[in-house]
């Protein structure tokens, strides 16, 4: 390595990332760094701030944070790897990717990670040190090479990669073992691949992930923030052997991409277990028998079952021998069986027995809590520090991160540090006295948000340990000063913050100087007087600059407008139980699914249906095959028991039947007279036209169907089911191509939970922010609650236009 002894006269230094400066940064909303080396600057945009960071010479700028309401930019030498991250309002943290990454691109010229040992384990010498070796590359002479501490670097563009001088007097320098970043190649099965290849192995152009044309799909980027579903780049969000994409060819739904394997060893896979933790992706035990006692087939063999879950396709999943494993993100470890009649089964793995203290702050797999956000609106008193409800959804609809988890956001708001705050599960809480309950989110790019909760009016009771949950008071409808959604269109006269501080006039510059939110710069925002407004569309609602010199801005406490009853669909007045079982499952709380109806012939229940307006019920077309005369049918609304009907049920005749004209399994029934909308009889919401339910969304089915002898026969039962993307559901192992794009799958692949005979035509509803949406009509399945055979439902969003046309014209 003689050239390292030479003073290089010229280096071709290419900055990573050209064009938009922000492409080189990772962003996190609501995050701030506790930095000791920083500069505060006044700028008008995040792009300006990025330029300032790039041009800084007095220190290496690794991050910056931007405060939009202050128009303030803070550039910093630290990042989240070197200093604590704090929760803060009105701030976005931007961190340079190159300083967060512990992998190298190409030869590692721009590697800025923290590896400080060589391949043989020798400790690196500091670049600024003179002993034991006098360096030719020093921080002073090479300020752009990132020669920090004793970290491995490649200041001379060595093709063999990063290196360092060593602390061994006998060894002047050695190369370091730095893994390759997965933007030019892939490790394992490519689930962390973040490159920009956007064509399939046959050369087809990839369809953008945020598009539903030409192929509708459930891999929606906003629902999978950790999967990096950007642009139309090849990705692997569902555990396939390698990255893939939907294609722009209407005749080819999806195809694998040709991504080369990285030549360096893969990154550590994290802790492994001899017992079941989470979904068992890290299980490395030696159980080799399925739940029914069948012996497992060896992963490397193709007999009796041919498959692609091979050690070659999943090199990081330890597919040794015939041991049960979970290489592709199934609910639990499984294996192919040696029985030619049974392709595969799950295995029975003992649960890990460990105390919470052993796992809660580790990077162990996180068990995501079940959906708990109540649809019956809870409220909180004061600033919500006494709130003890079960809401776990933020104001923008994001799911909350469990308080004991450090993924995706590391934090100090733990049950140990705040023992009196009741930091249970992932429920919204207010441990630090903020303006209302909040939580960390499961979106890596959004650290925290306030929760989708209302403040109690004077007559309401909050969700506390001693008080029952109450429905938001109807008296709120008399409020004249109220907001819709985030209040961007609010034009009321509220002029004090939630803390009671008077607002500063928008045209004033005292006590706070500002230029971005003034009547002149925002003429359409109606910035009159000192009234609360939301000119920037802040998710937390209207705000104002305050007259307190120590408080730049704060939010205003303005109630939400009460929706008219016609817009109140999908909101039962009794909170659903939301249990995870149907066949062998649980009995629903009476009238908690008030849109569920019973279709009857000759007094007998035979199918379910869903009330979508006072005069109209949606059901399955196959339920109406035997008799075309609508007078044969009766619709029972508000029932909980199948046979012993309550006195206040409504029984309606059917005057008209409408079958979908292209023979889809969906139909509309017009009732003989409008149903009276009550707490027990209430319509579900229709989805937006062509809306796609995201893969793994938790939805609910209800019905009086066959229960296989389980408890609750004759009573309305419910089940929680995950939606399964059609691409997955149509695998050979499951429904083998039978599911059409106008249908959706939902169910537990382990079996035991499903809709069944008598449930046909009934609803599959999915919770969205604050209400239930009718996304599916129970249609068909291969058997009932069978292993690897999920239920199939008509995708209602594909027929919304037809449904609305029929109702409008009849």
From Swiss-Prot:
Pfam families: Kringle, PAN_1, Trypsin
Swiss-Prot/TrEMBL keywords: Blood coagulation, Cleavage on pair of basic residues, Disulfide bond, Fibrinolysis, Glycoprotein, Hemostasis, Hydrolase, Kringle, Phosphoprotein, Protease, Repeat, Secreted, Serine protease, Signal, Tissue remodeling, Zymogen
A GO term from the CC aspect: extracellular space
Localization per record: Secreted
Location of the active site: 622, 665, 760
S-S pairs: 49-73, 53-61, 103-181, 124-164, 152-176, 185-262, 188-316, 206-245, 234-257, 275-352, 296-335, 324-347, 379-456, 400-439, 428-451, 482-561, 503-544, 532-556, 569-685, 579-586, 607-623, 699-766, 729-745, 756-784
Signal peptide: 1-19
Glycosites: 339
Other noteworthy facts: Plasmin is inactivated by alpha-2-antiplasmin immediately after dissociation from the clot.
PANTHER family the UniProt entry points to: LIPOPROTEIN(A), PLASMINOGEN-RELATED
Domains: entry comment: Kringle domains mediate interaction with CSPG4.
Name of the protein described by the UniProt record: Plasminogen
Gene name, Swiss-Prot/TrEMBL: PLG
